[in-house]
Amino acid sequence: MSQDIYDYANKLERAVRALPEYRKALEAREEIKADEAASQLFDEFVAVQEKLQGLMQTGQLPTETEQADIQALSQKIEANDLLKGYFNAQQALSVYVNDIERIVFAPLKDLAK
């Protein structure tokens, strides 16, 4: 039985990759990689995201300057159609991921009751 759970997980992984929303996000990411300006903006977004996660892990908040930089980056992303398309595709895919997470972790939540 324990092997079955891994088989199910692998089937689920393949099913997620087969979703139109996943393929759309993947295509959008490839378009970003092909565009130098969009790629640089995406890399900047990832760096800022990592920095924010580091701050959160240490219980710190971004400074006012960092908040202003984040706001400026957000505006640049909103103005870039490739990035906007990618994040919209990611959002559509996250609906599935959130639902799957809720379903998979339901038994663990039951243990806490």
From Swiss-Prot:
Stored InterPro entries: Com_YlbF (IPR010368), YheA/YmcA-like_dom_sf (IPR023378)
Taxonomic superkingdom: Bacteria
Disulphide-bonded residues: none
Record family assignment: Belongs to the UPF0342 family.
Protein name, UniProt field: UPF0342 protein Sez_0866
UniProt source species: Streptococcus equi subsp. zooepidemicus (strain MGCS10565)
Lineage, top ranks: Bacteria, Bacillati, Bacillota, Bacilli, Lactobacillales
